[in-house]
């Protein structure tokens, strides 16, 4: 008999619905008018979810979310700019690495891996250094599941007259974001996260005026957001071969997103998943790494068992054999592992995951207390 698909307790790729997977069974011509209409409808809905209005445009891009992050930074940030990067995890550090490779001056503002970025500290940093032109913020630092206070930081940037670029890779669709009201200049996310599509397409939702001012700025051909946008405006087509099946799956996923009730309903389901998971894991003896006030309902980091019998590869394999896929830890300060709460999942799947983890502890002889 064929193996049953495992349930992915990861922050993307994630478990998708049958309707989303079925959408990939059709082939599309990349220059066909029907596919162009598909692209246009997806982009319009993404701007709507972000609360962007007419002042913002969506630029899709082939590749993972990091491709879109690098494309956005490389296109929107001038080479003589100076960027403040609040850093409390691996994905914040990745932004700094991209800026370094692009040759763009930047300043990292460090926070602990369990500490949300402080709007007050960001305000003070901007006040100290008038050369800072941009802030590049990770909304939800997936390495721990840490939520940074986007609205407060956006208010600081707006008051200080600094541009704000937001990596919303793991928050877009699950948490409320209002681009126009917040004054955010660009938001970046991807198809295979909280929208519950499949991986393969990133996108940036950008203030139209900022994008139109960025012509010729990108050092890359493939990652030039302005050129991608301008070409789509002229032709309705992608510059290079588009991920046709990924886009079709995202269209189906967006239809389900709206049918569910949009961001409020999606966020509420993830919150129920998270609460079910944390309660069940605590009953087994596990503790979350983050304080509940900083915890996002997308992915939870748990301290690893202290028992010497614990080793993540064997633990992972035992849980995988029961039909669930965990995520390794990504912290520098503690031995941890992560469990995602997103995807086409509900509380029943979270209870099943807890049971599988409990079974793994028993089969491997790992004591929790």
UniProtKB/Swiss-Prot annotation:
Main enzyme class: transferase
Cofactor field: pyridoxal 5'-phosphate
Classification via InterPro entries: Aminotrans_V_dom, NH2EtPonate_pyrv_transaminase, PyrdxlP-dep_Trfase, PyrdxlP-dep_Trfase_major, PyrdxlP-dep_Trfase_small, SP_NH2Trfase/AEP_transaminase
SS bonds (residue pairs): none
MF terms (GO), sorted A to Z: 2-aminoethylphosphonate-pyruvate transaminase activity
HAMAP family for this protein: PhnW_aminotrans_5
Functional summary from the UniProt entry: Involved in phosphonate degradation.
Protein name per the record: 2-aminoethylphosphonate--pyruvate transaminase
Organism expressing this protein natively: Burkholderia mallei (strain ATCC 23344)
Gene (UniProt): phnW
